[in-house]
A protein has these predicted regions:
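Intrinsically disordered, low-complexity terminal regions
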Residues: 1-158, 162-177, 181-242
Length: 242
């Protein structure tokens, strides 16, 4: 990526992150009182998708039992929402949080097919998430860091967000745009398809096949020695072997 492209991307992402940051003490939203308490919440319906938003920190654990605990400032519990609708667990808030000592969600689940993080939220796995097909999405300054074991993983990252993956998969689909990053050098895949544009970066590790397309100041970096490689470099895009 050229110096001017990096500067423009950094400027745009800074503006996005400022608009999406919910834990900055700018006086907008509810301020936590600093008295942290942990409360268990019941989940009465089945779900196989999770959507996290509004700057919350979520820790995911695949388990035989389903459970959900909220660790947050005492006065924030009433505005943190956790509800299942049409098989989707939505974790969010009714109001913005301007400052908090803690705003953690600890979720244990059995099976999952889709995880989406948006609006400055952070998502982490505490163990390896096993699934046949898994769809992952980060946007609007959010971060996701997962260890996975899948047949197929389809991931997308946009608007200054970061997605970091480790583990193993048979096939990886990766799509990054608008200054976002997909960091999957520690995810061992057999077949990978990667598309990056608008100042985004993708790093991956593939053994058998690679299809890569980079345009508009984007970079795709790959580890491994795939036997079949198809590369398409657009305007100021780079595809680089590591």
């Amino acid at each position: 990526m050229t110096t001017i492209s990096k500067f423009i991307t950094a400027l745009i992402m800074s503006l996005l992150l400022v608009s999406c940051q919910f834990n900055s003490d700018f006086g907008f939203g509810v301020r936590g009182n600093g008295d942290v308490e942990t409360i268990e919440r019941s989940i009465d319906e089945n779900f196989n998708e999770i959507i996290i938003s509004r700057g919350l920190d979520v820790y995911l654990t695949q388990s035989d039992q389903v459970s959900l605990h909220v660790e947050a400032d005492e006065n924030l519990h009433d505005i943190i929402t956790t509800k299942v609708e049409n098989g989707i667990l939505r974790i969010s808030t009714d109001e913005n949080i301007s400052f908090s000592k803690s705003k953690k969600i600890m979720l244990s689940f059995k099976d999952i097919s889709k995880i989406k993080a948006t609006s400055g939220s952070d998502v982490y796995s505490t163990n390896t998430i096993v699934a046949d097909n898994l769809e992952l999405s980060t946007t609007s300054g959010s971060d996701m860091e997962l260890d996975i074991n899948t047949q197929v993983v389809d991931c997308s990252s946009t608007s200054g967000s970061d997605l970091r993956l480790s583990g193993i998969t048979n096939k990886l689909y990766a799509n990054a745009t608008s200054g976002s990053d997909i960091k999957a050098e520690n995810l061992k895949s057999k077949i990978s398809e990667a598309r990056a544009t608008s100042g985004a970066d993708i790093t991956l590790n593939t053994s058998d096949e690679l299809y890569a397309k980079a345009t508009s100041g984007a970079d795709i970096k790959y580890y491994g020695n795939p036997e079949k490689i198809t590369k398409k470099d657009g305007v100021s895009g780079n595809i680089i072997k590591q």
